[in-house]
């Protein structure tokens, strides 16, 4: 048996790969001899323990593969106890105790590949009990360190149970339970890390799971739960490298003790009891060893170093108890675990803030794998699920257990600068956490003092500003009077009506309304003189020009010099009527024949020998009497009939024209233009033309050198050839009986 044993540190997959060809070649001699009832199969079936060509090295492929093939045929041929290997697809012919499995057609290379796959599931953790072919019966020996899965299959197969029962009870149910637990934890972690349950509830669930696990372990002490196969992810590998080496050392130490027990006692039942007693002690040693380790080892797998202090309390080594790390403020990116050197420095900075709680001593190896799988899960969920990152983070969604670490960190005056990010974090980090940085942690950073300082600064700034006076707007530019006369009044009845109705056709509508707001409201009456003498202001402007001019052509852009209106052409009917009214009220005064001598006699007789005060009945009555006497004398001087009744004397014309406040030389110039008879009095047409020239001069127009005939014709009003009789039959000079006014 010594020649068939492989070295302790040898890898089963490597040996199977190197000897696959030789094993296939050995199938020609070894398997043939077994099928034909050769010496190897007969010797093993009889239980003599003599080696065959495959076992002792006499055959072609001596070594581990030949040993396993021999074990397979030995177990199937002897009929005592189950085989240590999985049965070939041919069936269970060897279990009947027949003569060597004559119906088997599987090659040794297939069996070697199956052995290599079963051994290379995980690193070696302990020795594997196998049947002693030399001793026969149920004796168990330790050959080499193999995986936990292989050990569980072998231990379950040793005994009087059937091979089908070994597969159903020993291997599948623990795997199914572990997978269900793993998926349950994954579903529990598949939510937003901010909206998870409180740590206290999670702790209670873990306690109940540990109690149930202890009860199962006490009821079935002979079973060893195989290690679950975790997903090949880069994050759990760091945690596995931290926790596995210590447990593997314990496993090697326990394997040596178990091999000593197997060497001293060779009976089958005694060896099973020793193995059953060794396994619980080995499990307790592992749990006690893992109790002292989490304070130092699991930190590299559970810390996220490049985050500010608000996120350190929730990502501390206390995640063994609280499995969901919660995202607090100031997490710009979700980073993968960094190298252990940086992690140790960040862990030392975080130690004064967070207290590490040790794990309970009664935790087995399966719990360690659960915690290792449980801690990286929230990172994977936060990277994969975008809906949880996009959710709105409010104050009510944050658990109450995560509030106190944040306040504790905020009370510290200084925050350490975050270290440089690893280059792999660019591809893993998501862009969504900065949005939560803008919404959730903005309010804690604004303290009460900063808010009050900002409010006081704004109040002081507003108080120091000089108050502006909006009541006096800047002056408006002068309006452009295109197409209007410079003497046109600014406000007319049309503009006032448009302002009251709300519509305006002029560009100065806003200026008019602003002026009206400052003063009192105006009525429909125009504020300025709407009854102006300027006929140009009353004309309608901006009308479309006549399409046909005097020449008959359709030249819209011609100047039409002969068809335009000129102020020197004629006097309008309205102006003529106004001037005639002034003439009618002043005509014939002081022109009654013999009026001067009669006026002198009347004044002397009235004021004869007494003073005006003596004639009156009180003070002031003399002045009133004089005014009345003067008015009566003036009215008595008016000529009632004859040619003198149509004239306005020069003194009366001078008195009326002097009210225009024009210089005396200009008034004399106007008199020379209109006094055509040189008789010291003006007729109706002459007086009307004189008033019209004075009005034109007041509007800024020059006094013409001569008055055109059209103006005289318009002043006559259709009455041509009015004969004005001269008083005294030509004594006034001129020798002409009359002239056309």
Swiss-Prot record:
It comes from the Eukaryota. Transmembrane segments: none annotated. Residues 18-151, 183-567, 603-641 are annotated as: Disordered. Residues 26-36, 46-65, 94-104 have a biased composition (Gly residues). The keyword Repressor does not apply. PROSITE patterns: EH. Signal peptide: none annotated. SMART domains: EH. Residues 303-312 have a biased composition (Pro residues). Residues 385-406, 603-616 have a biased composition (Low complexity). This is Increased rDNA silencing protein 4. It comes from Chaetomium globosum (strain ATCC 6205 / CBS 148.51 / DSM 1962 / NBRC 6347 / NRRL 1970). The gene is IRS4.
């Amino acid at each position: 048996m010594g020649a068939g044993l492989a070295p302790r540190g040898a890898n089963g997959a490597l040996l199977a790969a190197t000897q696959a060809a030789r094993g296939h070649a050995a199938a020609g001699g070894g398997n043939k001899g077994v099928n034909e009832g050769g010496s190897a199969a007969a010797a093993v079936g009889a239980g003599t323990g003599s080696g065959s060509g495959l076992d002792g090295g006499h055959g072609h492929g001596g070594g581990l593969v030949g040993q396993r093939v021999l074990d397979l045929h030995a177990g199937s041929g002897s009929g005592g106890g189950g085989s240590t290997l999985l049965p070939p697809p041919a069936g269970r012919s060897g279990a009947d105790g027949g003569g060597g499995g004559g119906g088997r057609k599987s090659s040794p290379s297939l069996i070697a590949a199956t052995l290599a796959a079963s051994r290379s599931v995980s690193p070696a953790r302990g020795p594997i009990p196998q049947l002693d072919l030399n001793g026969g019966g149920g004796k168990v020996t330790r050959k080499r360190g193999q995986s936990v899965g292989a050990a569980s299959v072998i231990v379950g197969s040793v005994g009087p149970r059937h091979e089908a029962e070994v597969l159903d009870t020993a291997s599948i149910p623990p795997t199914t339970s572990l997978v269900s637990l793993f998926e349950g934890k994954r579903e529990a972690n598949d939510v937003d890390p901010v909206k998870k349950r409180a740590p206290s509830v999670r702790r209670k669930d873990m306690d109940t799971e540990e109690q149930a696990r202890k009860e199962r372990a006490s009821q079935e002490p002979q079973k060893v739960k195989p290690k679950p196969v975790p997903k090949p992810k880069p994050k759990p590998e760091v945690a596995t490298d931290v926790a596995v080496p210590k447990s593997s050392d314990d496993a090697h130490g326990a394997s040596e003790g178990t091999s000593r027990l197997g060497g001293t006692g060779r009976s089958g039942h005694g060896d099973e009891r020793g193995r059953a007693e060794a396994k619980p002690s080995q499990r307790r040693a592992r749990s006690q060893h893992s109790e002292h380790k989490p304070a130092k080892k699991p930190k590299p797998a559970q810390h996220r170093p490049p985050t500010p202090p608000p996120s350190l309390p929730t990502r501390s080594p206390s995640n063994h108890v609280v499995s969901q790390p919660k995202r607090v403020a100031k997490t710009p990116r979700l980073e993968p675990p960094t190298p252990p050197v940086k992690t140790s420095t960040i862990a030392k900075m975080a130690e004064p803030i967070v207290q590490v709680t040790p794990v309970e001593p009664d935790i087995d190896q399966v719990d360690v794998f659960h915690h290792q799988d449980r801690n990286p899960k929230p990172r994977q969920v936060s990277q994969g699920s975008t809906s949880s990152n996009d959710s709105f983070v409010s104050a009510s969604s944050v658990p109450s257990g995560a509030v106190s670490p944040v306040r504790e960190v905020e009370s510290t005056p200084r925050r350490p600068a975050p270290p440089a990010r690893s280059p792999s974090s660019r591809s893993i980090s998501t862009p969504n956490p900065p949005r939560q940085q803008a919404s959730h942690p903005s309010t804690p950073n604004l303290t009460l003092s900063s808010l009050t300082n900002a409010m006081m600064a704004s109040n002081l700034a507003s108080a120091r500003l000089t108050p502006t006076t909006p009541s006096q707007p800047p002056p408006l530019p002068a309006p452009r009077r295109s197409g209007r006369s410079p003497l046109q009044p600014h406000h007319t009845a049309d503009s006032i009506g448009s302002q009251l109705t709300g519509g305006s056709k002029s560009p100065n509508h806003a200026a008019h309304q602003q002026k009206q707001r400052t003063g009192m409201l105006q009525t429909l009456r125009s504020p300025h003189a709407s009854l102006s003498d300027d006929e140009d202001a009353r004309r309608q402007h901006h009308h479309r020009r006549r399409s046909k001019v005097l020449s008959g052509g359709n030249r819209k852009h011609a100047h039409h010099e002969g068809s335009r209106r000129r102020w020197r052409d004629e006097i309008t009917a309205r102006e003529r009527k106004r001037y005639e009214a002034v003439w009618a009220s002043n005509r014939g005064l002081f022109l009654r024949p013999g009026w001067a001598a009669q006026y002198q006699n009347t004044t002397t007789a009235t004021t004869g020998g007494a003073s005006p005060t003596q004639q009156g009945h009180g003070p002031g009555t003399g002045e009133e009497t004089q005014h009345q006497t003067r008015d009566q004398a003036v009215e008595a001087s008016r000529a009632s009939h004859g040619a003198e009744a149509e004239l306005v004397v020069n003194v009366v014309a001078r008195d009326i024209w002097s009210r225009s406040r024009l210089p005396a030389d200009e008034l004399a110039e106007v008199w020379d233009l209109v006094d055509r008879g040189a008789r010291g009095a003006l007729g109706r047409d002459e007086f009307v033309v004189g008033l019209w020239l004075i009005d034109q001069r007041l509007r800024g127009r020059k006094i013409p050198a001569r008055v055109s005939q059209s103006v005289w014709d318009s002043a006559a009003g259709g009455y041509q050839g009015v004969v004005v009789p001269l008083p005294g039959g030509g004594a006034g000079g001129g020798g002409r009986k009359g002239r056309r006014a």
